[in-house]
Amino acid sequence: MNPRRKNRLILVMLVLVGLGLATALVMYALRSNIDLFYTPSEMVNGKGEQQLKPEPGQRLRVGGMVMPGSVKRDPNTLRVAFKLYDASGVISVSYDGILPDLFREGQGVVAQGVLQDATHVIAKEVLAKHDEKYTPPEIEDAMKKDHPAQAVGDNSVRPS
C-alpha cells in the first residue's frame, strides 16, 4: 500500500472512531434527561404489552388524581406526602416544596421525580391540572379511560 493511501485510511479510521465516541458520549449524557410518563396503574401492573415496570432510581413522571384524605403535611417543614390513584392503581408521593395553588384532593396532578421503590415516588416537581386544553394527550387518554365523567368536565355525574 502506498503511503498516501495509508495516511488517508488512518485519517478515515480516526474520524470514524471520533464520531463513534462523540455519539456514545451524547447518548450517555441524554440518557439521564429522559423522563417516562406513567399512570398509577402502569406503575403497579406494568406498561405496554410486555408489562414493563419502572425500576427504583429511575426518573419518571406520574399522573393521576390526588386521593381524598391522603394529603399529609409536616407542620415544621414544607414536606408533603399524598397518594395518586386511577382506576386500578395507587402510589404514594413525597414532595418537599411549595405545592401549586390549584393542588387539592380529587384534583389531577403530575409529579416528576425519582422512583424510590415500586409504589413510592420522591417528587422534585408537582404540577396541578388546571384546564383540559392544557393536558398532555397521554394524561387525557388515561383520565378519560379511568374517570370518563371527570375527564370531559361533566360535573352532573359524580361517582359515589
Swiss-Prot record:
Keywords: Cell inner membrane, Cell membrane, Cytochrome c-type biogenesis, Heme, Iron, Membrane, Metal-binding, Signal-anchor, Transmembrane, Transmembrane helix. Residues 30-160 are periplasmic. One of its GO terms (biological process) is cytochrome complex assembly. Residues 133-160 are annotated as: Disordered. Residues 1-8 are cytoplasmic. It is found in: Cell inner membrane. It holds the Pfam family CcmE. The keyword Cell inner membrane applies. The chain crosses the membrane at residues 9-29. Residues 133-148 have a biased composition (Basic and acidic residues). GO terms for cellular component: plasma membrane. InterPro entries: CcmE, CcmE-like_sf, NA-bd_OB-fold. Heme binds at H130, Y134. It is a single-pass type II membrane protein. GO terms for molecular function: heme binding; metal ion binding. Heme chaperone required for the biogenesis of c-type cytochromes. Transiently binds heme delivered by CcmC and transfers the heme to apo-cytochromes in a process facilitated by CcmF and CcmH. HAMAP family: CcmE. PANTHER family: CYTOCHROME C-TYPE BIOGENESIS PROTEIN CCME HOMOLOG, MITOCHONDRIAL. This is Cytochrome c-type biogenesis protein CcmE.
